Amino acid sequence: MAKTIAYDEEARRGLERGLNSLADAVKVTLGPKGRNVVLEKKWGAPTITNDGVSIAKEIELEDPYEKIGAELVKEVAKKTDDVAGDGTTTATVLAQALVREGLRNVAAGANPLGLKRGIEKAVEKVTETLLKSAKEVETKEQIAATAGISAGDQSIGDLIAEAMDKVGNEGVITVEESNTFGLQLELTEGMRFDKGYISGYFVTDAERQEAVLEDPYILLVSSKVSTVKDLLPLLEKVIQSGKPLLIIAEDVEGEALSTLVVNKIRGTFKSVAVKAPGFGDRRKAMLQDMAILTGGQVISEEVGLSLETADVSLLGKARKVVVTKDETTIVEGAGDAEAIQGRVAQIRAEIENSDSDYDREKLQERLAKLAGGVAVIKAGAATEVELKERKHRIEDAVRNAKAAVEEGIVAGGGVALLQSAPSLEELSLTGDEATGANIVRVALSAPLKQIALNGGLEPGVVAEKVSNLPAGHGLNAATGEYEDLLAAGVADPVKVTRSALQNAASIAALFLTTEAVVADKPEKAAAPAGDPTGGMGGMDF
């Protein structure tokens, strides 16, 4: 395909136009008085959102240079969303301010590489200042306030704080769509996985269609169980103990299944058979998680264990097991606390090293099942469009709350960034590096100015006033008051704020050092096909 090339100022200005097109659409959503953006979909109802990354992902520009500029800023929003789960609009606003100020200096003759070094040193200093000023999140109220700001709804913040209180900081909080109006919180104690009983004959509570086993033994097998002679020696030992048995295996079928069912119906022996969750290596890992949680061992030929020679000492234990048609919950496994912590640390290390979003999500679920629990927030709304928008806001707020617990919080509303600008005085830079640091100083006020603008206030006046207030005091855009923001519950996770600045600066530095852009030449539309009759009109058939 033919390419088109632009150089120098033309190249940089083309990229900047693309950046501005995207940033101008995103920045109207910033702050408590930010507006929404409607996104048209090829199929189905349009989406209404105030989430920066969702808007950025939808924008495709026609001009090849502008398209590349917009794609670079999308990267800022996506990276910030991946790392911190929020702050995508702030990152976009910062990137726009850094690029605008930087290109002005490049056009005036500054050396782009000198500016880049200055920007990097200034960002490092501001990040250090932000982390030093961060306050640890210690109370449920602080989590509720932070999540409430992210979602733009305090009731959502309260519910997320309640969920985190119940399942712990490592627990998983999932958001589901509900048919009923409003918000509900459901909590799961113990380990739950999405596999139910193999046969309906195992049910012990006919009304609720559940099989409930009190203080059972748990047999974990990595292969299929089909012949009864493999299972019989172990079954006899379990029957002698008088305890029920939960079997989790790749599958339980044939005479092994019918033997268990017949004994259950006759009342001789209570048991439930369940298929192991997952596939392949993930199934093996989840069985191992269950073994550690219940204090048992996975019976597998890989480790030299077989069903015929298995003993009761290889079985896991739990206080209670509840099995429904679709899921199994193991409550209070009898595993060793130290072994569980070791497994948790191992999974956490795998999460750090994983570069696949899907793998990371699955590992996170396994971690939650071992370390905490699972909370489900069910969100309902009047229309499908509102429901999607609400669900998205809650998911963002959950990640925001987790980021707050991880690294602490700073004053929100763009104030922490603006008030960290004086720390740049400590840098002893000269020439273009000093100019680069000054570009960052100017850009640090951009989020606050945009929040003020969206709230109908004069940006310059607000920024000037806030820069002269004590640390942590600033504009609460929701009320229009100047106050101690942390005390008023206006806080941002420092992880979100620093990620937004670091990612914006990274892309801005690339913009400034760009000297040529190579893009695909737009294809000309094909000429309309000619008259297939060759223009021989007037012939009468």
Swiss-Prot record:
Which SUPFAM superfamilies does UniProt cross-reference here? GroEL apical domain-like (SSF52029), GroEL equatorial domain-like (SSF48592), GroEL-intermediate domain like (SSF54849)
Sorted alphabetically, the Gene Ontology cellular component annotations on this record are:
capsule; cell surface; cytoplasm; extracellular region
The processes (GO biological process) annotated in the record are: protein refolding
Keyword line: ATP-binding, Cell wall, Chaperone, Isomerase, Isopeptide bond, Nucleotide-binding, Secreted, Ubl conjugation
Cross-link Isoglutamyl lysine isopeptide (Lys-Gln) (interchain with Q-Cter in protein Pup) maps to 132
- Record field: catalytic activity: ATP + H2O + a folded polypeptide = ADP + phosphate + an unfolded polypeptide
Residues annotated as coiled-coil are none
Q: What is its EC number?
A: 5.6.1.7
Instruction: Report the main location listed first in the record.
Output: secreted
**Residues that hold ATP according to the record:** 29-32, 86-90, 413, 476-478, 492
Superkingdom of source: Bacteria
This protein's name: Chaperonin GroEL 2
Gene it is expressed from = groEL2
